[in-house]
Amino acid sequence: MFLLRGRGHWAAASLGRRLPLRRLRSDSAAPCTPHFDVVVIGGGHAGTEAAAAAARCGSRTLLLTHRVDTIGQMSCNPSFGGIGKGHLMREVDALDGLCSRICDQSGIHYKVLNRRKGPAVWGLRAQIDRKLYKQNMQKEILSTPLLTVQKGAVEDLVLAEPEPGYPGKSRVRGVVLADGSTIYAESVILTTGTFLRGMIIIGLEMHPAGRLGDQPSIGLAQTLEKLGFMVGRLKTGTPPRLGKESINFSILNKHTPDDPSIPFSFLSDSVWIKPEDQLPCYLTHTNPRVDAIVLENLHLNSHVQETTKGPRYCPSIESKVLRFPNRLHQVWLEPEGMDSDLIYPQGLSVTLPAELQEKMITCIRGLEKAKMVHPGYGVQYDYLDPRQISPSLETHLVQRLFFAGQINGTTGYEEAAAQGVIAGINASLRVSRKPPFVVSRTEGYIGVLIDDLTTLGTSEPYRMFTSRVEFRLSLRPDNADTRLTFRAHKEAGCVSSQRFERALWMKSSLEEGISVLKSIKFSSSKWKKLIPQIPISINRSLPVSALDVLKYEEVDMESLVGVLPEPLEKYTACRELARRLKIEASYESVLSYQLQEIKEVQQDEALQLPHELDYLTIRDVSLSQEVREKLHLSRPQTIGAASRIPGVTPAAIINLLRFVRSTRQSRQQ
C-alpha cells in the first residue's frame, strides 16, 4: 500500500498488475489500471526524444499526448539547427536520438552557417518540410519497440512517500487523466511545452490555448504549483504565414543550399534530396513604414505591453523596432514544404491585430501583394524555475519526476530535443536504480545547456550559442560521436549496435589516418614542389609531416591524395572521414592545451557533494544564510557546479571543499 494524491485528495491504494498494451490506445480504452516503467507527457520535440530514449534503454514507456496526429509537429519555424543548435543536434544523434535522422529524411534546404569561422563553430542548419517531418517522426515513434502512444490529457500526479536516501518530499507513482482514470509509472517526464496555462494573443484578444487549435493544460499547472514548485511566466510568438504565389521573388535576394549538403546524423552518408532539387530561400528587409505601423499601434498590442519576458535572440518585430529604432531588419522567406503553398517570414514574429499585420506585410519589398493565410500570434505560458531540477533533469521536490523542454525555460526545438533525450535516459536508469547519465560542461553542449539551467536558472527563454561554451575547440559538431556514443552505450544502453559499430569504425579510421599522415614526412622544399599553392617556408630544416601540411587552409585530403595516392586514397572513400581528418589536423596543435584545461575543470567536477546534504540546517560548514538558500534551491552535485551559482562566494566554496574532504576522510576511516 502507498499514499497517492489524486484530484486534490489523499487516499490509499495498491499497484495495479502489469498488462500488455496495444501500440495505440484511445482515451477510454483501459479495461484496468495500466502500469508502465516510464510515462512521458507531451508529444513535442522533447517528448518524442524522451519517450524513444526511455524505450531504447529497455523501459516499457507510454507517451501521452492531447492529439496523436500532432506528434512531431513543428509549431513555429520550419527549420532545425543553426549556430550552437546544430551542435546540440549532433549530440542528440550521438545518443541515438531521432531528430537528426528525421531531418536528413525531411529537409528541403541544407546549409552550414558560420563558415567564415573555423569548423568548431559551424552551424549545421536545414529548412524542413513540416508535413514530411511529422510523418517521418510519427512513423518512427509508432514503430519503436516498448513504446506505446495514447491520447489523453493529464490533470494530476499520483504521489507516494519518498524513497529513503534520496532528496525529495514525495515520489511520483503515476498520472491522473482528465477522465479520472489513473496510469501508474515508476518515472514520469513532463514535456508540456507552452501548454501549462497557455494563452494565445492577437492584438487585444486573448484566449486559452497551448498552440493554435489546442487546449492548454490547466490542472497539471495547478498541481505543480500546489506541490511547491516555483512557477514563472514566459512568452514567445510566431510570424504570419504567407501565400507563396502572391510574393514577388524575382526582385529579392536568392539563397541556394550547399552542394554537397552535409547531413545531421552520423548514420547518414547523405541527405534524402539532391542539392539541385532543394528549394531556395529569399531575403528581404523591413523599412521605416513598418516601424511606423508598429509604433502607432502599440496600444492595440497587449502582448508587447506585458512585462513577461520573451526570447532575447528571436524577438518579435515590435521588440526589434522598440529596441533598435531606425534600423532595417532582415526577413527571410522560407518555404514550409515541397508541396506547400505557405511561406514562413522568419524575423517577422508579430502580435498586432490581423488587419494591421496585413498592412505591415504589404509595406515590405517583394510582399506588396502578399496574401496573409494565417496571422501571427503570441503565446504566454508557465515554466518552472530550472534550478529546481538536477543535472539528470529529475526534480528536487518530487523523486522520479523529470522536466524537459520549454517547461524548463528554454526556447527552440533543438534545446528541447537535447533535454528530452537526457530525461528519457535518466528516467529509465532511475527505474533500474542505476546511476544517472550526466553530460558535463567539458563533454558537450548538452552539458553546458543543462548546467546553465540548473545552476544559473533563467528569467527569459534560454537559447544555446557557441559563445556559452568554454571548450569550443574540443566540443565540435564533427566529433560528437566519439565524445558521447561510447559513454551512452556503456553507461545507459541507449545506443543501437549499428550506431556503436559506426562510431567505432570512425574512431579507429581517424586514429589510423592521423598515424599514417604523421608518418609521411618530406622536406619543405619537396612539399612545395608537390603542392605549389601551400604557403610553406622552404628554409625549414626539419622534415614536415603530411598532417602538418593538411593544416594549411589551401590543402585538403583530396589534394594530398592527388600527390600521394598509394597510402592515402582509402581515407577519401568516405567523405565524412576525409572532412574529419582535415578538421583534426587543423586543431591538433591547440587541442593539447585545451585538454589540459579540461582536466583541471574535471578535477573540480569530480568532487561530489552529498545529495542528502541539507544546506539550510547543516552546522558543520560555515555558510551565510544567503549562500545556504542559493545552494538549497539549486542543489549542486559537485564543487564545480556550486562555484558557478551567482552569489556563492569563493569563501563558501573553500568551506564546502573542506567539508567534502573531511567527510570523505571520515568515511574512509
UniProtKB/Swiss-Prot annotation:
What tissues is it present in? Answer: Ubiquitously expressed in various tissues, but with markedly elevated expression in tissues of high metabolic rates.
UniProt keywords (A-Z) are: FAD, Flavoprotein, Methylation, Mitochondrion, Transit peptide, tRNA processing
Can the keyword Lipid biosynthesis be found in this entry's annotation?
no
An example molecular function term from Gene Ontology annotations: flavin adenine dinucleotide binding
Q: Which residues bind FAD?
A: 42-47, 154, 217, 406
Residues of the transit peptide = 1-25
What SUPFAM superfamilies does UniProt report for this protein, alphabetically?
Answer: FAD/NAD(P)-binding domain
Concerning InterPro entries, the annotation shows:
FAD/NAD-bd_sf (IPR036188), GIDA_C_N (IPR049312), MnmG (IPR004416), MnmG-rel (IPR002218), MnmG-rel_CS (IPR020595), MnmG_C (IPR026904), MnmG_C_subdom (IPR047001), MnmG_C_subdom_sf (IPR044920)
Function in brief: Component of the GTPBP3-MTO1 complex that catalyzes the 5-taurinomethyluridine (taum(5)U) modification at the 34th wobble position (U34) of mitochondrial tRNAs (mt-tRNAs), which plays a role in mt-tRNA decoding and mitochondrial translation. Taum(5)U formation on mammalian mt-tRNA requires the presence of both GTPBP3-mediated GTPase activity and MTO1 catalytic activity.
Assembly: Homodimer; forms a dimer in the presence of potassium. Interacts with GTPBP3; forms the GTPBP3-MTO1 complex composed of homodimers of GTPBP3 and MTO1.
What protein family is recorded? Belongs to the MnmG family.
Protein name from the UniProt record: 5-taurinomethyluridine-[tRNA] synthase subunit MTO1, mitochondrial
The taxonomy runs: Eukaryota, Metazoa, Chordata, Craniata, Vertebrata
Q: What is this protein's gene name? A: Mto1
